[in-house]
């Protein structure tokens, strides 16, 4: 999936499936919208690209699935950087970009034919703790609420969560590629957690922040 909320250059490679996220109530982009079929498109201001993932989970079936963004793609050609970022996606140089993405996609296929189950971004290592980074950039009470919710729903995760919150390792960008079984398991785990966080946050009357569940899912 390529999650996009605006008109932008998109690759023509058939491995990529652009989807208009947050399409509900917006002008069409000429792409399939996350407001069709079984959807949560209205939650996009809070859930970000997750509304596209939810749409895919409920409305399509494929052997492998992944998520990238209209300004960021996995890059399997360079060893120094795992991403093709928006600064390099020059609409005036689409021929070279298409060629790069095509070769990169061929390398991607080799990963799965070699037996890999999932591909993730390279981990980032923070100078401050996992919790400290969230406190610096967001509202720490929301991260604590998320951790408590996971502990209550899945008690076996408690030790791991404690280690992660105190650690310095994180996977940013909400990007991955995996087989459908892993994807289905992940979605079946993630969305009940987010639903419960949303319910608890409402009951506790905690302040509202846009994109909250996108930020939390990146940590989950």
Give the positions of each predicted feature.
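ER/Golgi luminal nucleotide-sugar-dependent glycosyltransferases, focusing on the catalytic module
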Residues: 1-220
């Amino acid at each position: 999936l390529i999650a996009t909320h605006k008109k932008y250059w998109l690759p023509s490679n058939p491995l990529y499936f652009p989807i208009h996220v947050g399409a509900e109530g917006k002008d069409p982009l000429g792409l399939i919208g996350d407001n069709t079929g079984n959807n949560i498109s209205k939650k996009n201001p809070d859930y970000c690209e997750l509304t596209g993932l939810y749409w895919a989970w409920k409305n399509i079936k494929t052997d492998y699935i992944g998520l990238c963004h209209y300004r960021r793609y996995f890059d399997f050609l360079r060893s120094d950087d795992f991403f093709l970022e928006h600064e390099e996606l020059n609409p005036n140089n689409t021929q070279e970009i298409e060629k790069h993405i095509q070769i990169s996609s061929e390398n991607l296929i080799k990963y799965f034919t070699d037996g890999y189950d999932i591909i993730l971004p390279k981990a980032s290592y923070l100078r401050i703790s996992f919790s400290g980074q969230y406190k610096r950039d967001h509202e720490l009470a929301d991260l604590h609420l998320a951790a408590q919710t996971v502990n209550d729903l899945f008690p076996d995760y408690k030790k791991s969560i404690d280690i992660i919150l105190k650690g310095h390792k994180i996977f940013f960008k909400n990007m991955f590629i995996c087989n459908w079984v892993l994807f289905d398991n992940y979605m079946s785990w993630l969305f009940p957690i987010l639903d419960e966080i949303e319910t608890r946050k409402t009951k506790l009357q905690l302040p509202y922040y846009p994109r909250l569940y996108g930020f939390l899912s990146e940590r989950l």
